[in-house]
Design a protein with these regions (language model features):
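Conserved ABC transporter NBD signature motif
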Residues: 63-73, 82, 110-112, 117, ...
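ABC ATPase C-loop
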Residues: 146-147
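Helix-to-loop junction immediately C-terminal to a conserved catalytic motif
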Residues: 55
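ABC ATPase NBD coupling module
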Residues: 59, 70-91, 124-127, 220-227
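Conserved ABC ATPase signature
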Residues: 129-133, 137
């Protein structure tokens, strides 16, 4: 559920890329607390670059990023402490440590038990080394660790990468719940269009670094041909 009138993350005319070469061009995106926005598009469309530029890992070549009403810091760690948190596609867990130790490293105060209540499957795995977890379990742990930082916005990159569909289907409702019950804004990069649109409020389809299509999730679900045209850069 989104909250009209409030904006927690705003990208204004963002152009960003690598070595001075733009991978994203003139992108506008505003995210409200409690809103889930899906970024869709083929490989190389600029989805991950958008997330990395939003959190400060990739520099903006033009335009701006505002977080909580202020220009976003260039220091990634400062952004994370303020609540702008990236969940990368490599899952960001320490494979040589147990689930319990991963949670302890990320925990703030007594938040661990509260967050583990959101991921009850992890409680039975607390003593297991993370390298022995399935991909779905590692991704669940990555989300739990992100929640332990007290995020205001989660930037989730390719959550389903390499995971069985059943694992993805189990985690998506948790992301929706984080938005609805905790007011966390979410930007979700996802290749599975139907799954992304099942939890998103809005979606943008990127093609060659530009927004080719935008609308509510309901609008896009009702017009799959429009999504297909946007994916391949075809005119209406």
């Amino acid at each position: 559920m989104s909250f009209p009138g409030e904006i927690i993350l705003e990208l204004r005319g963002l152009t960003a890329g690598y070595g001075g070469v733009a991978a994203v061009r003139d992108l506008d995106l505003a995210v409200a607390p409690g809103e889930v926005v899906a970024l869709l598009g083929p490989n190389g469309a600029g989805k991950t670059t958008t997330l990395l530029a939003a959190c400060g890992l990739v520099p903006a070549l033009a335009g701006s990023v505002h977080f909580a009403g202020q220009p976003r810091s260039r220091q990634v760690e400062r952004n994370a402490r303020a609540g702008l948190v990236l969940v990368p596609d490599n899952r960001g867990v320490f494979h040589s440590l147990s689930v319990r130790d991963n949670v302890r490293l990320a925990a703030r105060g007594g938040a661990a038990d509260e967050v583990l209540d959101l991921f009850p499957e992890l409680r039975r795995l607390l003593g297991r080394r993370c390298g022995l977890l399935s991909g779905g379990e590692q991704q669940m742990l990555a989300l739990a660790k992100a929640m332990l930082t007290g995020p205001r916005v989660l930037l989730i990159d390719e959550m389903s990468l390499g995971l069985a569909p059943i694992a993805v289907q189990r985690m998506l409702p948790t992301i929706r719940d984080l938005a609805d019950r905790r007011g966390v804004g979410v930007v979700l990069v996802e290749q599975h269009i139907g799954l992304a649109l099942s939890i998103a409020d809005r979606a943008l389809v990127l093609h060659h670094g530009r927004v080719a299509l935008t609308g509510t999730a309901a609008q896009l679900r009702g017009d799959p041909r429009a999504i297909e045209r946007a994916y391949f850069g075809l005119s209406a």
